Amino acid sequence: MEPLNGPHIMTSALFLGIDTGGTYTDAVLYSETEGVLASAKALTTRHDLAVGVSGAVETVLSEVGGAVSRIRLVSLSTTLATNALVEGQGGRAGLVMIGFGPQDLARDGLAEALGTDPVIYLSGGHNVHGNETPLDLAPLEAQIDALSEEVSAVAIAGYFAVRNPAHEIAVRDLVRRRTSLPVTCSHDLSSRLGGPRRALTTLLNARLISMVARLIDATSGYLASRGIEAPLMVVRGDGALISAAEALMRPIETILSGPAASLVGARHLTGLDNAVVSDIGGTTTDVAVLDGGIPRLDGEGATVGRYRTMVEAVAMHTFGLGGDSELRLEEGGFEAGLTLGPRRLMPLSLAAHLWPQPVLAGLERQAQAGFPGRYDGRFALRTGLPKALAAGLTPQEASLYERITLEPQPLDVVLTSTSQRATLDRLVARGLVLIAGFTPSDAMHVLGRQDQWNAEAARLGAEVFCRRKAGSGRPVADSPAELAERVSARLTRQSAEAVLTALLADEGISGIDVAKSAFIDRALTRAPGLIRFGIRPDRPLVALGASAPVHYPAVADMLDIESFVPVHAGVANAVGAVVGQVRETVTVFVTEPDEGRYAVNGAGEHQIFKNRADAFARARDLAGTEARLAAIRSGADHPVVELSDHIDMPVIEGLEKLVEARFIATASGRPRIAAG
């Protein structure tokens, strides 16, 4: 918590920013005239997110006198959706594909993302001009009851639905009549062509609905209990704000919400217009670039983990590297190679802080054993998700899940056969079970650089890990301190590699594997030789995250770059959440399916005009009107609309032929705030 000299008495309007990450929930109280007045952190409580939210918010409220009655806006950013995709988690969802076939699953990673979740194919869809192929609902009607028993949400993707959404709407209405499941339509998420990738985006959105709903419900419930009557906003992946109601319908847009908020916060806290921003959290490190004070956007759609979506978001490069990253021993080598991530574990020091007896007892038993065991230093516990989210488990998964409790148990007790390890991994992927193990956070406790949790558990965890053997037969390390120093060095190196990987990608330089390049290795280690290698970013590094002051001075030194760690670096996401704007963009298309006939498609509308000027006028008006309405729905007070167009109309044999016209309207403004 950032301390103040006694309760701060305020008379002006206050904004409350909240960021819910995988490990911590942050809160800030912000005034447009005085900046950050108070900030605090509390552990994120996945089984009941309201506990973490209330813990952080109550602390900042206690620092500012009369704050509750002065709060006019609450804004929320989160890394939960990002972390879920990085770690392969999310609820089970059913996919309904209209006009597609099984062969389309092979494109854009859709089959991999779908996994064992059910898919139903329907005849139907439209062509590029919005003309339909007849829709056959019979297969869905026959399977809908069974489907509703095994999934938590439904995703619908229709062929060329962005040009005519009628079939997606018909399927959506049927699902809503027959079930109470949340439904996502692809045309509501993107106006871009590319059916399989739009289907992928829709599927991921459906999987995230329950997770984001739990966060918004927890936050809303807490605010109501405290009598805080202010609009609740959520940060989108491009840094803009949307209302909580809109976020519930389009949770996929909150992927990279936390990182986007951190970029907005970094600009606000440092005043730097041009910078490389690296935000290290518990689960991920997120790297992006500020150009002229504005985050670079990813024109191809946000990539998170293995998936490239159609969500417009900051050009953020997300790496499975953080303070809670899994420490892994690279098997097979003569020397003991260590690597971090991409999976997040609960640090042993945190697990013992929350449950001292079972964790310390388990580690002490393993440390005193005659020889190291395969599962030493690992514990399993339930995340506490509602029982409904455990639907669709196989008998083997259900049996193992029943044996796992809300309190950590050693893996060598939980697992009775090696085949159960794969079963456990599936439960982890569903977000039902969390593994505790040795992480960089534990290493920092061993070295005395962090002290907020149980240092004895960290030391015992390091001792147990040290007993593992490299290919040479030697132990991984001779002491807990040696192991911890190696983990710290590994985190520094992988963090530097993450920054370079992101910058090379932004420069369009491909074909260089930073982790394997001898050139990069010589540059980062500054190894002596006949040739001196060097590599240096052209702008300063802004380091964010609670552990940034611990890790990033060494990262900046390795990169030979000037660095800044702002005063409120640990809560930059929460700051960014309250200083952003609402921004909505709507695109309407005009095509010429036949000579003298002009099709207007977009914003849920399909119309035919005989006059090109009339079609253009309708498209321009529709885009502007819908963008303004969308901004108002998303919580803007007085949105300002900007219009642009791109008309592709070549002259062929002396005649103009319309290929496509795009009319783009963007409405933006500050969010509405509660009356004083």
Regions found by a protein language model. Give the residues of each.
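N-terminally biased helix-coil "hinge/interface" segments that flank
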Residues: 2-676
